[in-house]
Amino acid sequence: MAGSLLASHLAMAHPHGWIDMSVRVITDDNGVATGLHQTWRMDPFYSLVVFEELQQVPGGSMEEGLDQLGGEIRDNLAAQHYFTEVRIGSEKQSFGDVTEYTALERGGRLTFMFILPLASPQPLSGQVLEYQVFDPTYYIEMVHEEEGDEPSPQALILNGEPECALSVLPADPDPELVMQAALLDTDEEGEPGLGRHFAETGRVDCR
């Protein structure tokens, strides 16, 4: 039941919930990027709804329900490229299958953690890696973890060798798109790709 709720939550349009996220770019000892470790914290209201549904499953524990939910989230996201786009230089990167993931309760929030592997590991030396994580329909707003009004130092981390400049760039959507999104009801879908215009950009500059 919680899985179907999540599927519908992910399939609709414009910002009626949000996810606080943090990203760790994984590199090997040679400074080659191998993937992105992402942590998503669902908003408190949605988390409460999911936890209440899991508690109502007869004969099941919360831990078992979360294990099943993690697999359902992974499967739903796989069909949508995990809401993630990555570029290194001018080249858009493809992804491998997500096999490492978990769903858990942390501080009252439903938290989903997973490693998104690059299909082909890429050296970062002399390169700029940029990523965006967004719901294409903008039903869910994806934002990096914040401290005050600024991205948290833990919102983007580089794990591994190269010394690179890390930054999270804010979205700068056209005012007409902001109005378009605000006028959508919960049962209406936005234009395909609407969420891209509201996406923050994580940048790892190793030049």
Where would I find each of the regions flagged by the language model?
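Sequence-level motif detector for i,i+2 pairs with an aromatic at +2
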Residues: 33, 81, 199-201
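N-terminal signal peptide c-region/cleavage motif recognized by signal peptidases
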Residues: 8-10
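Sec-dependent signal peptide recognition
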Residues: 1-4
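Residues that act as N-cap/strand-start positions at coil-to-secondary-structure junctions
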Residues: 17-19, 80, 125, 198
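Structured domain cores in non-transmembrane regions
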Residues: 45-124
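Early extracytoplasmic/domain-onset interaction patches
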Residues: 15-48
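Mature, soluble, non-transmembrane domains
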Residues: 89-207
